[in-house]
């Protein structure tokens, strides 16, 4: 039973949704992905980001081929040395069954995306004990297929068939042990909160009927709310956040195999950068652009024959340095917050000197374009 007719694709919607959930509360610096597969979600978390300030990632899966693919996906590459992170990142990939996984310390977040429907009853109980009894994360996110949505994939013309009778042939994947409807999923989640009263749960999801490429015709028969989300998500929050801690195995005799450890390079500098550091980076980006595209005019400026006004796309500055991206904090309005003098200036101009005796006489920010006027002073 396919789910490929969503736009954006369902797996993309799911990763975005999980990431957005992690943004919404206590800073997530350590995370365990249970049933990590080939590390698609872990890979999504690798780029340095202040919104989810990850420093430690761990993934566990029972399938060795999946862990091999995850290892390849998460390997440090040449570009990781060229675009250094501004905080450390350590990754551990583990091979084994969560039933044997009993000696793990606290992590800030646990994600189990499209995992629980592959579990037998004993594994579900082990999952509950591991996560809520031992790890006690500040947030745990569990996603699983919503069985009620399956009738859409069956393409029944009347959309009135009953889904109360279930067999594995009605499931989305032959390896699924079960698929819950919304009431069953909620019943399971509330039972966890009753057993572990420090947790509360809320429900969300991704993949609505109107996200289907051909879903408009179906909406004439039933509203999107009739079936809910294609992927249903439970978000468990702990009422009292624990201090951040890296996760590691305490029991060296555990049958869980530490398959791979990966450490990413990073720049050991304090952040955010100072205003002077930030301006130096901006000037470097400006001059790199000038020497690359306006070399002749720049020499005329040096000779005192003319002034030079250049429109510099914001994207060029953005891509010139990860430090600049960090300083801008994913929004060029931060530029002004770093430079309060720009707010006071009628023309939003600033005079800056550098070691080449150039002076950036004026910087105007209009529609994500920087207009820079250069003069040369002896």
Swiss-Prot record:
It catalyses: small RNA 3'-end nucleotide + S-adenosyl-L-methionine = small RNA 3'-end 2'-O-methylnucleotide + S-adenosyl-L-homocysteine + H(+). This is Small RNA 2'-O-methyltransferase. It holds the Pfam family Methyltransf_12. One of its GO terms (biological process) is siRNA processing. PANTHER family: HEN1, SMALL RNA 2'-O-METHYLTRANSFERASE. One of its GO terms (cellular component) is nucleus. The lineage of its organism: Eukaryota, Fungi, Dikarya, Ascomycota, Taphrinomycotina. GO terms for molecular function: metal ion binding; O-methyltransferase activity; RNA binding; RNA methyltransferase activity; small RNA 2'-O-methyltransferase activity. Its main location: cytoplasm.
């Amino acid at each position: 039973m396919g789910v490929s007719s969503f736009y954006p694709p369902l797996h993309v919607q799911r990763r975005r949704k999980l990431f957005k959930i992690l943004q919404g509360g206590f800073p997530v610096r350590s995370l365990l992905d249970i049933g990590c597969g080939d590390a698609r979600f872990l890979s999504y978390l690798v780029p340095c980001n202040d919104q989810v300030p990850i420093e430690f990632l761990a993934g566990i899966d029972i399938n060795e081929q999946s862990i091999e693919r995850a290892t390849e996906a998460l390997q440090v590459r040449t570009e990781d040395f060229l675009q250094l992170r501004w905080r450390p990142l350590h990754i551990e990939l583990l091979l084994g069954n969560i039933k044997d996984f009993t000696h793990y310390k606290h992590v800030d977040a646990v994600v189990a995306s499209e995992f629980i429907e592959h579990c037998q009853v004993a594994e579900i109980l082990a999952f509950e004990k591991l996560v809520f009894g031992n790890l006690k994360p500040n947030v745990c996110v569990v996603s699983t297929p919503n069985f009620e949505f399956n009738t859409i994939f069956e393409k029944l013309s009347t959309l009135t068939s009953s889904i109360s009778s279930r067999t594995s042939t009605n499931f989305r994947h032959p390896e699924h042990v079960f698929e819950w409807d919304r009431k069953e999923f909620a019943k399971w989640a509330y039972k966890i909160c009753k057993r572990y009263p420090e947790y509360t749960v809320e429900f969300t999801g991704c993949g609505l009927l109107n996200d289907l490429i051909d879903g408009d015709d179906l909406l004439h028969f039933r509203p999107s709310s009739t079936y809910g989300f294609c992927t249903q998500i439970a978000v468990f929050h702990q009422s009292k956040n624990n201090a951040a801690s890296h996760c590691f195995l305490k029991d060296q005799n555990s049958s869980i195999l530490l398959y791979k450890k990966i450490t990413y390079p990073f720049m050991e500098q304090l952040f955010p950068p100072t205003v002077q550091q930030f301006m130096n980076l901006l000037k470097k980006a400006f001059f790199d652009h000038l020497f690359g595209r306006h070399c002749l005019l720049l020499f005329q400026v040096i000779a005192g024959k003319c002034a030079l006004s250049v429109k510099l796309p914001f994207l060029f500055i953005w891509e010139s340095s990860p430090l600049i991206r960090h300083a801008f904090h994913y929004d060029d309005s931060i530029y002004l917050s770093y430079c309060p003098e720009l707010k006071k200036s009628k023309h939003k101009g600033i005079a800056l000197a550098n070691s080449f005796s150039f002076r950036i006489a004026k910087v105007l920010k209009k529609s994500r374009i920087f207009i820079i006027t250069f003069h040369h002073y002896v």
